[in-house]
Curated annotation (Swiss-Prot):
Belongs to the universal ribosomal protein uL29 family. One of its GO terms (cellular component) is cytosolic large ribosomal subunit. This is Large ribosomal subunit protein uL29. The keyword Transcription regulation does not apply. InterPro entries: Ribosomal_protein_uL29, Ribosomal_uL29, Ribosomal_uL29_CS, Ribosomal_uL29_sf. Pfam families: Ribosomal_L29 (PF00831). Keywords: Ribonucleoprotein, Ribosomal protein.
Length: 63
């Protein structure tokens, strides 16, 4: 999701998205640890998405 799309969401929606992404990251890490993860680029994408959501949440908290 693009940062501009994230900025249009409410804080509650962003927090829900963050929880969802953290759960997905956990699942991917477990798959990587057990050797089941085929598409390792997904870890990087999820980590980047988490950072984007946290950045927008910080922006909204300061505004």
């Amino acid at each position: 999701m693009k940062a501009q799309e994230l900025r249009t969401k409410t804080v509650e929606e962003l927090n829900a998205e963050l929880v969802n992404l953290l759960g997905e990251q956990f699942k991917l890490r477990m798959q990587a640890a057990t050797g089941q993860l085929q598409q390792t680029h997904q870890l990087k994408q999820v980590r980047r998405s988490i950072a984007q959501v946290k950045t927008v949440l910080t922006e909204k908290a300061g505004a």
